Amino acid sequence: MFIHRMKSNLASLFLSFFLLLACEFTFSYADFSTTTSDATHPSATATEDIFSTPAVPSLGLAQNPSVYEPYRGDKCGGYNAIQVSEYEKGVLAILQLNGDPCYAYGTDYPFLALNVSFDSIDRLHVSIQDLYGAQFQFSKRTDVWDAPLYHFQPQFGDRTYNFSFNSQPFEFWVTRVSDGEVLFDTRGHKLIFEDQYIELTTNMVDDYNVYGLAETVHGLRLGNNLTRTFWANGNPTPLDRNAYGTHPFYLEHRYTPSENLNSDGQPSYTSSTHGVLMLTANGMEVLLRPNYLQYRIIGGIVDLYIYVGGTKNPKDTVSQFVQSVGTPAMQQHWTFGFHICRWGYKNVFDLVEVKENFKNFEIPVDTFWSDIDYMYEYRDFTVESNAFPKDKMMEFFNSLQQSNQHYVPIIDAAIYAANPINRSDDVYYPYYEGVRRDIFLRNPDRSLYVGNVWPGFTTFPDFTNPETTNYWTECLMNLSAAFGYNSSFPLPYSGLWIDMNEPTSFCIGSCGTDKLDQNPVHPAFILEGEPNNMVYMYPEGFEHTNASEHASAYQASVSQYYATATSTVESVKATSTPLNVRPKYNINYPPYALNTEQGEGDLSNLGVSVNATYHDGTVRYNLFNTYGYDQSRVTYDSLTSIEPNVRPFILSRSTFVGSGKYAAHWLGDNYSLWSNMIFSIPGALTFNMVGLPMVGADVCGFMGNTDEELCSRWMALGAFLPFYRNHNSLGSISQEPYRWESVAESSRCAMNIRYSLLPYWYTLMYEASSQGLPLIRPLFFEFPNEPSLANADRQFMVGSALLVTPVLEPNVDYVRGVFPGDNSTIWYDWYDHKVIYRQHNENITLSAPLTHINVAIRGGNIIPMQKPSLTTHETKQNPYDLLVALDSDRKACGSLYVDDGVSIQQESTLFVKFVANGDSLSIESYGDLQVHEPLSKITIIGLPCAPIGVYFEGVQVESFSYLEDTKELVLTNLEAFTSTGAFSNNWTISWNLPV
C-alpha cells in the first residue's frame, strides 16, 4: 500500500507542476470549462436527457451498431506530447490535441495527462486521462473493485520490457527485452479521447493468435475478424456476442521459425506469449482485424496493463495476470464432486427422490441444488412452505449431513418490491429493510428503481453501498430460518448460487414505478413449459435415431409457432450523430452505439438501465459491468461473517476481472445441442486463462430436450471440467444420468476417473489459488512451440498430465485427436496403459463406444489418486494410489497438496513431491498435517523389463507383478509399509533391473 501511495503522490506532484505550466503555456481553465463542462459532467445535463421512466414496458429504442458505419477517425489529428518527464519508474507528460476537435462520437478533450508506470519487472501500466479528471476513473473506486495491481510491492531485478514513444503525434510501443518482440504498438494510429468515445489501436502481427476477451460463445482462438462487445448481458449464451461477464484481457501467442529441425526432422519453432488488460467498467468494443486490434470505449479513461510474459510457456503470462488481479479462492474439497440440479424440482420430495435414485443406481453425487422453485412466488430469501415444509427440509438436511452430501440454493439479484396494499406483503423483510437502510439502486430523481424479474416488479441492491453487506448477511440468516434453521445447522446450505446478476431485468427502465399495487405480476413473456411455449427442441441428429418422436415434436413446434404472435422492430439510430459535429452527451443512447446482444441494441434492454444510480450518485453507465463482481464480493463477506474461516462456495453467472477471488462460474444457459457441448470446451479454457478456473457448463444442456447419446457424451466430458453439474430447464425432459442405462454407465465410468483423481484436482486448485495457474489448459499451453495447436480446442489438458479427447458429434463410435510432442514424448492410454503410437502432428483415430471417453497420460508425470467412492468425503477416507508414467528417459515427477478441505486459514497442511528415476521412486513431504490414509498401490508404466527385486526403504516388497504387454510394474499391499499414513515419512522405493 505504501509503495502504491508513494508512486501516486509522486505522479500527482508532477501532474500539478505540468498543470501550472500548461495553463501558462497554452490555455486557461475558463476556456477549457466552457468547451467541455456540459459534455463531461452528467449532473450538468438536463434531467430528461438521463432519466427515462417509460409509461409502459417496451423494448426501448432500436439501435444500429456504430461498428457497421464508415470509419470516423480519419479526420482526427490525435495528440502531441508536451512537457514530457521521464524518470526511473515511468514517464509523465501532457498530451495536447493536434488540430481541431474531430467529434467522432463525442467532444474531444484539448489536454490529457499521460502517466506510464513501470509497475514491476514484468508489468507496465499506461494511464491516459483528461487533464482535469472530469472523466470517470475506475481506479479511484477501490470500494467497488480492488486488486493487488493497485498495491504492488517493489521487485528487484532488471525490467523485462522497454517503453518507447514519439511525441508528434504521440504514439508508443512496448518491447520485450529478451527477444525484441514488440508487444503493443500504436504507431500509425491516432489516439481519440472524447467524453463518450475513446479509441486506442495497436498493430498486430500477421495471422495473430489471440485468446481471452471473455465472455462470449466462440472458439478458443478468436481470429482476426471479430468484434467483441463488453456489456454484461443476461441473454442465453449468444454466439459471438456479449454474454454475462466482462474480462477485457487477451493473451497473444507468437511462433518464430527456428533454423534447427526437431528430433523428428521437422521444422521447429520457438514461441513467446504476452498479455494485455484494458481495465474499464464502462461499455467497450474490441475490434480484432487482420493487422490491428482496436479499443472503442464509451466512457472512462485509458487504463492499460501490459504483461510481458516470456518465451517459456503461456502459463507464465496467465500467472502474471491472475496474480495481479487476485488469485482465485481455494475451493472446498467437496465442490470437485458431481452436482445435480434442475429448474423443476418442485418440492422437497423431488429432491429426496433424486437423492435416493443416485444411491440406488450407484452413481456418485455430492451436491443437490434448488433453482427458484423453492421460493415463495420466486421471492429471494423465502421458502414455499407447502412444497418445502420446514420439518421435511430439516429431515432432508439431516440426511445430507449423515451421508456427507451438500445442498446449494439459488439467490437472484433482484428483490421483490412489496405491494403496498397487500397486507401479506408487509412481512417481506428483504424489501422493507432494504428501503429502510436505503440500499437499493435509485433513479436519478432518487425514487426507487423498479424493474421486472421472476417475482414481478423488483428492486436491486446496491452492492457498492457499505451498508449492504450487513443487510445481505441478515437476509442469508433469515433464509436459514425459513428452511428450518436450528443450532445443529449454522447454515443448512453449503454454498450459494447467485444468478441474474448482470443484473437482468425484463423491461426497459424503471417500469414498475408507481405500479407496485399491481404486484405480483407475471414476467413479460411466457415461461418454458407454459401453454404456447412447450419445449420441442432436441439435439442435432435426433431425427436420425428417433425419427417418429422427432416428427411428432417437429409438428407440434410448427403449430405452436403459428399460434404465437410475432412482431418486429425497425432498427434505426435513436440519436443522430452527424460527422464532425459535436454530439450531445447522452448516457441512455450514447453517440457510439455498441453492438450488443440485448433486444434491438438498446443498452438498457434486459438489464438495469444505465441511468440507475448508486448510493453515491454514480450512474450505472460507469459501473455497468461490475454488478456481479460486487454481489460476489458482498456474498463472500457475508458468508465468512456467518461461518468464519469456512471457504465460501459461490457460483456466479455474471463475472468481472478478478471475480475468481470470490466465486466460481458456470457458462450460463446453454442448449441441449452438440454445438453447445463443443463450445463448452473453449469457454472453460478461456475462463481458466482469466483467473476463474472453477468453471463448467450445464451438462446435457439447460434449454431444450437432451437425448440419450448427447447426455451420455456430455456427462463424460463434464467429468473432466473443474465444475461438474447437470442442470436443465423448466419444461424440458428429465436428464438425471440414471434416466438412461447408457448414460448411467457412461457417468459411472467417467466419475470413477474423476473421483479417483480428486487428489490431483485438489492439488491443481492449490496451484491455481497460490500461483494463478489454470486447472485445465489448451494443448498449446503445454506444447507452446507447435503452431498446429494454435486452434486446437476439441481436446484439452487437465493439468500437465492428462489429455482428454471427447466425442463431440452424434452417431459415431470413434474420435480423432492429436497427441502433441516430438518422438521423445510418450503418451499412454488411461485404461490399458499401452503406449499410443503416432507420428508428429498426426491426427489418429481412436475407438470411442458410447460409454467411453478417451483419456491419455503424458509420460513424465506422477499422479496421486485415491480409490473412488460415491462421495468426495468417502473418497478422501480411502487409501492412496500413485500412477507413475515414465518418459523416454525413464523419469517422472509430480506433487500433492493436502489440507482439511474446508478452512480459509489452515492450521496445518502437507505438500508432497514425487520423483522417479530409472530405478527408484522417492517422496519428500513438507508440512505438519498428518494424513492417516495409507498407500495401497503404485503403478509404474514405461519400465522396459521386469525387476529382479523391489525394496521399500531397503525392505523387500513381495507383492508386485510386471505386465510385459504394457511394460508395467504394479506394487500392491503397500499398507503394511505405510500404516501410519502414506506420506507421514519420506521414503524411497527402489528396484533392480537385470543387466
From Swiss-Prot:
GO terms for cellular component: endoplasmic reticulum; spore wall. The active site is at residues 502, 669. Keywords: Glycoprotein, Glycosidase, Hydrolase, Signal. Glycans are attached at residues 115, 162, 225, 422, 478, 486, 546, 611, 670, 823, 843, 986. Residues 1-30 form the signal peptide. SUPFAM superfamilies: (Trans)glycosidases (SSF51445), Galactose mutarotase-like (SSF74650), Glycosyl hydrolase domain (SSF51011). GO terms for biological process: carbohydrate catabolic process. This is Uncharacterized family 31 glucosidase C1039.11c. It comes from Schizosaccharomyces pombe (strain 972 / ATCC 24843) (Fission yeast).
